[in-house]
Amino acid sequence: MKTLLLTLVVVTIVCLDLGYTRKCNKLVPLFYKTCPAGKNLCYKMFMVSNLTVPVKRGCIDVCPKSSLLVKYVCCNTDRCN
């Protein structure tokens, strides 16, 4: 009976698929946030004039194209930005 109960609990957890969400760094990389559903990429935004210091980090659904003034770097693993 205990085995059956344990099996049911495991199957329930697997079927519910508690969901995996991406974790992305905030502007200060010591801190991160859990991304909302659908935002599966992390990004860093730089000013082209200074590519060493990011001005924004976070979660995003689609990586924006870089422009003459702003460069975006996107990745798809936890805290990769």
Swiss-Prot record:
GO terms for molecular function: toxin activity. Residues 1-21 form the signal peptide. Keywords: Cardiotoxin, Cytolysis, Disulfide bond, Membrane, Secreted, Signal, Target cell membrane, Target membrane, Toxin. It is found in: Secreted; Target cell membrane. Expressed by the venom gland. InterPro entries: Cytotoxin_Cobra, Snake_3FTx, Snake_toxin-like_sf, Snake_toxin_con_site, Toxin_cobra-type. Its main location: secreted. Gene3D superfamilies: CD59 (2.10.60.10). It comes from the Eukaryota. Disulfide bonds join 24-42, 35-59, 63-74, 75-80. The keyword Lyase does not apply. One of its GO terms (cellular component) is membrane. One of its GO terms (biological process) is killing of cells of another organism. Monomer in solution; Homodimer and oligomer in the presence of negatively charged lipids forming a pore with a size ranging between 20 and 30 Angstroms. Shows cytolytic activity on many different cells by forming pore in lipid membranes. In vivo, increases heart rate or kills the animal by cardiac arrest. In addition, it binds to heparin with high affinity, interacts with Kv channel-interacting protein 1 (KCNIP1) in a calcium-independent manner, and binds to integrin alpha-V/beta-3 (ITGAV/ITGB3) with moderate affinity. Belongs to the three-finger toxin family. Short-chain subfamily. Type IA cytotoxin sub-subfamily. This is Cytotoxin 4N.
